[in-house]
C-alpha cells in the first residue's frame, strides 16, 4: 500500500518513472524492499572508496583529480624526492603524474652509517653527491676518491667490484 502511495506521490511531482520502485512487488515486506533499494542505491553510486572498482566505471569523470597521498606521492609540482618509491597512482586517466624514484646508493657500503638514500637532491648535492646530467651515474665525494664504474662491469680504479654489480 505504501508503495502505491509512493508511486502516486512521484506522479504528483512529475516523476512518472522512478527506478527506485520499478520492479517492486507489493507483497514484498518492507524490509525486503528496503534491502533491494539499498542495493540499487549502492550500485548506482558505486563504492566511493574505490573509484576504480568494477561497479564504478562510467560513474566518474574520465580525468580524476590526482590522488594526492596514495602511495605517498604528491602529484603536483616537481618530483617528490622524499618518498622515493617507483609506485604512482595508476588510473588517473590521462592526467600527468610525476614518477618519483629512489636514488639508489650504488657505491656499495657507505662509510658513514647515515642512510642517505632518502635525502632530497639538494641535500645530496651538499654532501657531494651530484647527479650526472645524461648518465645515471653518481659521483660521491664523501665516500673516498675511488671513481666507481656504475655500469655493473666492475672496473673501477681499484679493481674492486664488490658493491656495484648490476645495480641499474
Swiss-Prot record:
Protein name: Protein GRE1
Disulfide-bond pairs as recorded: none
Extent of Basic and acidic residues compositional bias: 8-20, 27-43
Keyword Transferase: no
Organism in which the protein naturally occurs: Saccharomyces cerevisiae (strain ATCC 204508 / S288c)
UniProt subcellular location: Cytoplasm
Main location: cytoplasm
Disordered: annotated segments: 1-168
This protein's UniProt keywords: Cytoplasm, Stress response
Induction, as annotated: By osmotic, ionic and heat stress, and by water-deficiency.
Gene coding for it: GRE1
Note: 'De respuesta a estres' means stress response in Spanish.
GO CC field: cytoplasm
Start-end of Polar residues biased regions: 56-81, 120-144
Amino acid at each position: 500500500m505504501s508503495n502505491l502511495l509512493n508511486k502516486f506521490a512521484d506522479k504528483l511531482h512529475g516523476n512518472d518513472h522512478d527506478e527506485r520502485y520499478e520492479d517492486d512487488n507489493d507483497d514484498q515486506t518492507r524490509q525486503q524492499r528496503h534491502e533491494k533499494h539499498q542495493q540499487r542505491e549502492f550500485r548506482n553510486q558505486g563504492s566511493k572508496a574505490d573509484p576504480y572498482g568494477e561497479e564504478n566505471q562510467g560513474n566518474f569523470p574520465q580525468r580524476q583529480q590526482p590522488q594526492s597521498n596514495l602511495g605517498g606521492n604528491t602529484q603536483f609540482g616537481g618530483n617528490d624526492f622524499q618518498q622515493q618509491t617507483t609506485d604512482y597512482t595508476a588510473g588517473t586517466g590521462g592526467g600527468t603524474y610525476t614518477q618519483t624514484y629512489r636514488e639508489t646508493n650504488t657505491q656499495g657500503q657507505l662509510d658513514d652509517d647515515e642512510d642517505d638514500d632518502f635525502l632530497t637532491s639538494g641535500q645530496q648535492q651538499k654532501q657531494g653527491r651530484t647527479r650526472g646530467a645524461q648518465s645515471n651515474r653518481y659521483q660521491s665525494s664523501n665516500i673516498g676518491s675511488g671513481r666507481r664504474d656504475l655500469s655493473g662491469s666492475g672496473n673501477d680504479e681499484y679493481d674492486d667490484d664488490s658493491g656495484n654489480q648490476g645495480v641499474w
